[in-house]
Amino acid sequence: WRDTMVRLTGNGVYGIQCTFLIDWYFVDRTMISSRDYYPPLSSAPVKGSISQVVNSCISQVVNSSPSSPYPSIMHGYVRALIEAKRYVYIQTPYFMPTESVLVAMKTAAIGGVDVRLMVPRKGDAHVVAWASRTYLREIMEAGVKVYMYSGGFLHSKILVADDSMATCGSTNVDFRSFENNFESNVFFYDADTAVRFRKMFEVDITSSVLLNSLPPERLQVSFFARLWESITRLLAPVM
């Protein structure tokens, strides 16, 4: 099992608290808006840490839900892809992108940006894996490098771009996460944080297989396999 999680301290915690209270209202219909739930930050050291609470970088908590007016997290992914100048690295356990993300990935790669995607070599849902293959072939044809992680089940959900921004959270690169589920991501706009995410991705590459480097005959599938993949792709929005 390979996952990525972050611990947030400082003013960014208020965003997570707000997310929790919004979800609480959705479930219980109890509006909680008291400032008691947003206490002043303490300057004392964090329990279990030798450091004090400091606001060392700019972070943004972004949420998405069925009731959201816009798919905000998806917009964040698309913006990172279209604004990237050097690279965009993405990890996700499930890859069935919306048309907006798919086009943004292909456009960035065709434009010379080093776009890399890492997914698990062995997933936990066979139908999802079948549907993902058609998308993987499509982005590879556009120049996206696709890595299959073999060091365990890859559950990490991150994006890092140009050593300038990164995001981590609960969002998969698929229809349900972007448009239907309750999801939350933290976007970091900080070079040091982005570099840490990039280095983690580069370490994971050592436990991965680059699909683009395999002989063409290894990537060929039968007519019936392609037919089944196409059928499962039609079901991607509800998977």
What is each PLM-predicted segment?
Residues 1-239:
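Charged, low-complexity intrinsically disordered terminal segments
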